């Protein structure tokens, strides 16, 4: 059984701050899936800051609960049209997101943490997105198809 307890529109720090109540009690047969960083990049937070925070937190979490880290997909130009970012920031933001994804993948491998690379598995086509960043109904179905094989512990 899957139970979604997500935070949409949150930054990484918000996501990690919300975990304290969750981690205060034991959870059997639970896999914690976490994907974040895109909102931080869109807000202008430096990738090096995200990487330090993520590495510190996943090191702690990995000792408490089985993890699966989602590597975010890149953004499409629709995100400019819908107002999420400016045209001049689009290329830089996608480059930062790609570098952040490479960092996550390398560290998940080093730490033996399960990961799903949505940046390569998810189609980079506006047909799958509602706004160039967030999936639409068809996109969420595709996310679920990609993630399902990883969600058993």
Regions found by a protein language model. Give the residues of each.
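Histidine-bearing beta->alpha loop at or near hydrolase active sites
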Residues: 7-10
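Short, small-residue-biased leader/transition segments that mark boundaries at the very start
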Residues: 1-2
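Alpha-helical cap/lid subdomain in secreted, periplasmic
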Residues: 16-153
